[in-house]
Amino acid sequence: MARTPNIALVDYGVGNLHSARKGLEAMGARVTLSGQPLTLSAADGVVLPGVGSFDTAITRLNDRGLGDAIIQLVRAGQPMLGICLGLQVLFDSSEEGRLPGLGLLPGRVRRFRSEPGLTIPHVGWNQLHFDNVDCPLWRDLAAGGWVYFVHSYYVDPARAEDRAASAVHGSQHFTAAVCRDNLMAVQFHPEKSADTGLRILKNFVERAASRSAAEVAARCATRPPA
């Protein structure tokens, strides 16, 4: 990457920003922590982390004007990566709460069903199975990598084509990642998933950098000669 991309890490009082920031910086990004919509719009890419409850996350995003800002940025083509709860809030609704989600992806967040011997929350390492091998997050990754999960709820996309990866907990297959154009999100924590997770973060950083470079080239091409 010729230019260091600026990645905005959304600070809205929900999420482990320290680990995500360290992981992104290790992969070549300049990271800005911000809860300001204008700062997010100036970045080359945005990472939306999150841990905790669905309604709390939605409330804090909306109270800060970040919900509408994120929707507008995604629709404008800005690369966006959701992590854990940051994936779930992208959907229409959740069994956990009563507030509507951001609605960027159609579908609902569901709770794992109880079954004998199954631990909920799902905590620990699990294997990824790619459903969409063309998702930019999987570049230079082999299928079957192991990543780290901490969650009781999972997303159930209304469109099968939005599912980028899946995993299995007990007898239940669930969506582990989604990908649609510039919008990507994962249920697991890439910043805690060793080399596989760091490669995923690097792929997102490079995706943001390539979009930024393309925009610079387009501006130069349309600039009138001196």
From Swiss-Prot:
Pathways per UniProt: Amino-acid biosynthesis; L-histidine biosynthesis; L-histidine from 5-phospho-alpha-D-ribose 1-diphosphate: step 5/9
Example of a GO biological process term: L-histidine biosynthetic process
Source organism: Gloeobacter violaceus (strain ATCC 29082 / PCC 7421)
Function as written in the Swiss-Prot or TrEMBL entry: IGPS catalyzes the conversion of PRFAR and glutamine to IGP, AICAR and glutamate. The HisH subunit catalyzes the hydrolysis of glutamine to glutamate and ammonia as part of the synthesis of IGP and AICAR. The resulting ammonia molecule is channeled to the active site of HisF.
Catalytic activity annotation: 5-[(5-phospho-1-deoxy-D-ribulos-1-ylimino)methylamino]-1-(5-phospho-beta-D-ribosyl)imidazole-4-carboxamide + L-glutamine = D-erythro-1-(imidazol-4-yl)glycerol 3-phosphate + 5-amino-1-(5-phospho-beta-D-ribosyl)imidazole-4-carboxamide + L-glutamate + H(+); L-glutamine + H2O = L-glutamate + NH4(+)
Active site (catalytic residues): C84 (nucleophile), H189, E191
Domain of life from the UniProt record: Bacteria
InterPro entries hit by this protein: Class_I_gatase-like (IPR029062), GATASE (IPR017926), Imidazole-glycPsynth_HisH (IPR010139)
Sorted UniProt keywords: Amino-acid biosynthesis, Cytoplasm, Glutamine amidotransferase, Histidine biosynthesis, Hydrolase, Lyase
Gene name as annotated: hisH
Limits of the Glutamine amidotransferase type-1 domain: 6-214
Subcellular location: Cytoplasm
GO CC list: cytoplasm
Pfam families, alphabetized: GATase
Subunit structure: Heterodimer of HisH and HisF.
GO molecular function: glutaminase activity; imidazoleglycerol-phosphate synthase activity; lyase activity
HAMAP family for this protein: HisH
This protein's name: Imidazole glycerol phosphate synthase subunit HisH
UniProt-listed Enzyme Commission number(s): 4.3.2.10, 3.5.1.2
